[in-house]
Amino acid sequence: MLGLLVALLALGLAVFALLDVWYLVRLPCAVLRARLLQPRVRDLLAEQRFPGRVLPSDLDLLLHMNNARYLREADFARVAHLTRCGVLGALRELRAHTVLAASCARHRRSLRLLEPFEVRTRLLGWDDRAFYLEARFVSLRDGFVCALLRFRQHLLGTSPERVVQHLCQRRVEPPELPADLQHWISYNEASSQLLRMESGLSDVTKDQ
């Protein structure tokens, strides 16, 4: 009996050591919460809010929220956002899927232990290959935007225009992208072209 308990304990420790268990638990929970417990959001451009709090496991050596945690929390918020507005469901019906192709983060103020915050996510627009989303980390203590993240959500197997048309049952013109986002898109394109040249690949070879 003792041997079995030791084996189970060792197995549990190995699972936690080799897998990001809490990520694998929280991500489906975020999807289920968005799908079953929250109302559908019909406006694709509406801002959605995802609550959070800085836990001891989120801290770095300076007792601030670790920079990597911002991307992680934004991941949960973005999946919940795409679930509530129907984009993930539409992709499933169209037999397509999406991958994160690019991201950038601007940190304005640290989030500290036990500080409550919201991740406010909104769709900024789209082009012929990807959706562009923004996530703001807002402290609930004073409303300060502590971090601003941008994401390029690339679609495989379909186009953003077709997904939006599938959801709205009509053709919808994409909103004009903010100037700073357009600069970021240009940077990504220039970076892709430079990397293709360094690798000896032709312009026909596309990345995400």
Curated annotation (Swiss-Prot):
InterPro entries: HotDog_dom_sf, THEM6_lcsJ_thioesterase. SUPFAM superfamilies: Thioesterase/thiol ester dehydrase-isomerase. Residues 1-17 form the signal peptide. Keywords: Phosphoprotein, Secreted, Signal. Its main location: secreted. It is found in: Secreted. The modification Phosphoserine is found at S199. Pfam families: 4HBT_2. One of its GO terms (cellular component) is extracellular region. It comes from the Eukaryota. Belongs to the THEM6 family. This is Protein THEM6. It comes from Homo sapiens. The lineage of its organism: Eukaryota, Metazoa, Chordata, Craniata, Vertebrata.
